[in-house]
């Protein structure tokens, strides 16, 4: 029982530091763009030939989907997102690898950053806009970048773990090689986590 409580404490404290750091970075960048540039919605600042900073509010979900249902759906978005964040936190606590731990931390940090916007401002503030010739990527923010990076980390972790499992089931390695490969992707002590 004590070891379980110790594991939960270390997981909570380390994950909380990562998540809180990501949320602070996201909220500070949004605060800076909202309060210091004081643009009118729709105006843009050209940074490079493919990157603009724009002042826009997203009343929908990802990429502005369902924004026309905003007046009915903001509460539903908030509740659904909070449930998803709680479930992802549970998965993170149960994670067996550093990669999955980091991936879930990034997804949760980004999700909480956008939840704060939706709760405090009624919409998510987006400001990064990539475009090239006739292609225009939907406007996004750092929280969206954190979520995307977290998903990429989770996918890489899944496939690298799957590869070790497949190789060991084929019998291509002796026990020492298996242990070395598994140790590279698996953590055995929460003290060694990020």
UniProtKB/Swiss-Prot annotation:
Keywords: Aspartyl protease, Cell inner membrane, Cell membrane, Hydrolase, Membrane, Protease, Transmembrane, Transmembrane helix
Pfam families cross-referenced by the UniProt entry: Peptidase_A8
Enzyme class: hydrolase
Major location category of this protein: membrane
GO MF annotation terms: aspartic-type endopeptidase activity
Pathway the protein contributes to: Protein modification; lipoprotein biosynthesis (signal peptide cleavage)
Topology term for the membrane: Multi-pass membrane protein
E.C. code: 3.4.23.36
Family: Belongs to the peptidase A8 family.
Any one GO cellular component localisation term in the record: plasma membrane
Name of this protein: Lipoprotein signal peptidase
Active site: 126, 144
Reactions accelerated catalytically: Release of signal peptides from bacterial membrane prolipoproteins. Hydrolyzes -Xaa-Yaa-Zaa-|-(S,diacylglyceryl)Cys-, in which Xaa is hydrophobic (preferably Leu), and Yaa (Ala or Ser) and Zaa (Gly or Ala) have small, neutral side chains
Function: This protein specifically catalyzes the removal of signal peptides from prolipoproteins.
Biological processes, Gene Ontology terms: proteolysis
Residues spanning the membrane: 75-95, 97-117, 135-155
């Amino acid at each position: 029982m004590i070891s379980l409580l110790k594991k939960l404490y270390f997981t909570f404290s380390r994950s909380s530091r990562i998540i809180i750091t990501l949320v602070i970075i996201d909220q500070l960048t949004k605060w800076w763009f909202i309060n210091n540039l004081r643009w009118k919605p729709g105006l843009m600042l050209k940074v490079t030939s493919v990157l603009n900073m724009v002042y826009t509010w997203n009343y929908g979900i990802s990429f502005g989907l369902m924004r026309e249902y905003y007046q009915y759906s903001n509460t539903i978005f908030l509740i659904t997102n909070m449930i998803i964040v709680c479930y992802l936190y549970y998965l993170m606590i149960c994670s067996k690898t550093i990669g999955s731990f980091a991936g879930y931390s990034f997804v949760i940090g980004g999700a909480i950053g956008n939840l704060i916007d939706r709760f405090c401002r009624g919409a998510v503030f987006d400001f990064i806009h990539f475009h090239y010739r006739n292609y225009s990527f939907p406007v996004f923010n750092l929280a969206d970048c954190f979520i995307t990076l977290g998903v990429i980390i989770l996918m890489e972790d899944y496939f690298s773990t799957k590869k070790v499992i497949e190789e060991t089931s084929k019998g291509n390695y002796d026990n020492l090689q298996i242990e070395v490969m598994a140790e590279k992707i698996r953590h055995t002590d929460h003290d060694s986590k990020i």
